[in-house]
Amino acid sequence: MSRDLRGRGCPRGRGFQGWRGGWRGGWRGGWRGGWRGRTQKVEWKRAPEPASSRLVQSTLDQFIPYKGWKLYFSEAYADKSPFVQKTQAFEKFFMQRIELYDKDEIERKGSILVDYKELIEDRELTKSIPNISTELRDMPQKILQCMGLAIHQVLTKDLERHAAELQVQEGLPLDGEPIINVPLIHARLYNYEPLTQLKNVRANCYGKYIALRGTVVRVSNIKPLCTKLAFVCGTCGDVQSVPLPDGKYTLPTKCLVPECRGRSFTPDRSSPLTATVDWQSVKVQELMSDDQREAGRIPRTIECELVQDLVDSCVPGDVVTITGVVKVSSTEEGASKNKNDKCVFLLYIEANSVSNSKGQKTKNFEEETFQRSFMEFSLKDLYAVQEIQAEENLFRIIVNSLCPAIYGHEIVKAGLALALFGGCQKFVDDKNRIPVRGDPHVLIVGDPGLGKSQMLQAVCNVAPRGVYVCGNTSTSSGLTVTLSRDGASGDFALEAGALVLGDQGICGIDEFDKMGSQHQALLEAMEQQSISLAKAGIVCSLPARTSIVAAANPVGGHYNKAKTVSENLKMGSALLSRFDLVFILLDTPNEDHDHLLSEHVMAIRAGKQAVCSSAVVSRTNVQDRSVLEVVSDRPLLERLKISPGENFDAIPHQLLRKYVGYARQYVHPHLSPEAAQVLQEFYLELRKQNQGASSTPITTRQLESLIRLTEARSRLELREKCTKEDAEDVIEIMKYSMLGTYSDEFGKLDFERSQHGSGMSNRSQAKRFVSALSSIAERTYSNLFDLQQLRQVAKELQIRVFDFESFIESLNDQGYLLKKGSRLYQLQTM
């Protein structure tokens, strides 16, 4: 029994040996002999095709009216196919507009821009394809292929017509057909509606055509993606081209030669049958508006793949509108760790068109219309902008609408409003000149509890593009640019920080004094309006054309007027000098002001309409006449105030955001001669008063700041020319800012105090004091002084300081005095 079993079926039986021997001897020998003989004597011959099939195939090729059918569709041509009917409808649509397109540009780029609104508004097209929007959304690949084939056919016919005309002109015979070879052309739709929010991109969107808007936060390197790959059969050497959909590597299943049974294939990347395209991946983060903000949720991101002419169409920080098809990819990293993850997929978008919000000027008119601004205005919005502009005292209305919850501080709000509108950047396109920034920077310094952070958040909220960060929780790379390694490919990619994301907008930085070493990262961004990066072999520069609005608390919790701004904040002069306006907010007790403030707070808490009236303590000393004092009949502060009992209707932030966006986009003011003269006189007067000072805080930066703010004041009222009144308003705001900076502890204006000066506020007094101590030490042969002796010396020299111990501490910090004991100091200048 066992022998029979072994002989019949077991591996070690004779039957198996005989079968194996027969296989080895007969089949292998015959195969080898036949193969060797054929290779030496006879060439491979394909099986003869019947004449009928050859006739049918040639007839099909001859009678297909579309020469590029095989470029777009894999199925055979049929007259009654619905795709043929759609292609004919699109062909009529493009034939009417062929003269509007640049044919050479279309052939060079391999794509054509099609306005979606024109498609759905064309009567003939909607009559032929009634539900075109639904079909485009549900089966985008086929509709886009029909559009591509239609424009391919239109260009082919156009070229044939031109070739025939040339033949007639040259007098050539019209017997032969000209060879017309139009490449594959993609139809790229823009202005597609509706826009899909990123949170709604779920599994039910798979395979659908959608449009979404967001900020580019990461851009990968450009790589070649193989769309068709040639494979060589290892048996017969026949070459076949295999399409690779979505870039997924697939091997051919069998050889195309009927007699060959080969199953091993090697890819031939250098074959003319291999086709590659440029490929790039970008990560897009959703744009958060008021009604879409969700507390505690990280902004959603999605990967988008760009191919061919779409690569390099955006950089980190750009606001883009991407239309494309939602597709899925498997999680390759997770698949190796857990087998269950093979069923988990990631959604990504295969981009069909990218509309960049930069609005850059391009040579091609099509591209210029394509690269729209990131703010779109409906007819209702434009009417609202017109209504706002027609208001009387518009500056007063906008200033008081900026942050109605905060009481008073009209001049500070006016400075923030000017930063919101911004000036005009000069020499942007001129490669031979250095660009001059147009965005003003504002710093608010003051005691805690005066509403600095709320004003900052209000400005970022009103800005069309605002980023709000807190200084003590942000890093320097989080503010500028991060270089991250891509997990899948291992390449380095740029990730934009707060300043790059706030490009052409506002970046609000709260707790500015607690940033530590991150201050140095802001220096280049604040003046050059760009961020340079040199890390891991990548050297590049990213735009950061943003206005920085910062709020800071002084060291010690209370602003000490005996010290300069630099000493109060422990901040370098290089950074402070880049701020156009520095406002000092002091919590000074005033009975009338406190009474109105308490009424305002109680009204807000009770839910009533806020009382917007204000009373501001005068900070100008009457005894000290200076160029900084306001001598106008009706100063700006009086004009900005809301009188008690007045019913003030503030502009809603949503509407104000549209107004600011419209002004920044379409209004580009320039200085009139009268305004320029007013600014020049004020600047020269400041320089004249400052001549005798030991330090010179007034530089050309202050003059540039005045020009920027004057342009912003004109832009606020949608005027193209800056008037004399604009310049006078800006000068009053600048005076208010400088009064806080240059006032000493006694309320007097001291031009020896530099707002960004380092060291002692009272330099001349410190020099006299140290020289007196040096002469005493030489006379007594002792350089040790106790605190009582130091007080006596200061009294004899009539040195008046607000806090004597702080005065001595500052001398200790600067190295003039060395503390030897509890109340003992050693002079170090001997």
From Swiss-Prot:
Domain MCM: 394-601
SUPFAM superfamilies, alphabetized: Nucleic acid-binding proteins, P-loop containing nucleoside triphosphate hydrolases
Keyword rRNA-binding annotated: no
Catalytic reactions of this protein: ATP + H2O = ADP + phosphate + H(+)
Molecular function GO labels: ATP binding; ATP hydrolysis activity; helicase activity; single-stranded DNA binding
Enzyme Commission number, as recorded: 3.6.4.12
Localization per record: Nucleus
Single GO BP term: double-strand break repair via homologous recombination
A GO CC annotation given for this chain: nucleus
Pfam families hit by this protein: MCM (PF00493), MCM_lid (PF17855), MCM_OB (PF17207), WHD_MCM8 (PF25051)
Annotated keywords: ATP-binding, DNA damage, DNA repair, DNA-binding, Helicase, Hydrolase, Nucleotide-binding, Nucleus
Enzyme class: hydrolase
Residues reported to bind ATP: G446, D447, P448, G449, L450, G451, K452, S453
Function of the protein: Component of the MCM8-MCM9 complex, a complex involved in homologous recombination repair following DNA interstrand cross-links and plays a key role during gametogenesis. The MCM8-MCM9 complex probably acts as a hexameric helicase required to process aberrant forks into homologous recombination substrates and to orchestrate homologous recombination with resection, fork stabilization and fork restart.
The family this protein is said to belong to: Belongs to the MCM family.
PANTHER family to which the protein is assigned, alphabetical: DNA HELICASE MCM8 (PTHR11630:SF47), DNA REPLICATION LICENSING FACTOR MCM FAMILY MEMBER (PTHR11630)
Subunit description: Component of the MCM8-MCM9 complex, which forms a hexamer composed of MCM8 and MCM9.
Protein name according to UniProt: DNA helicase MCM8
Gene expressing this chain: MCM8
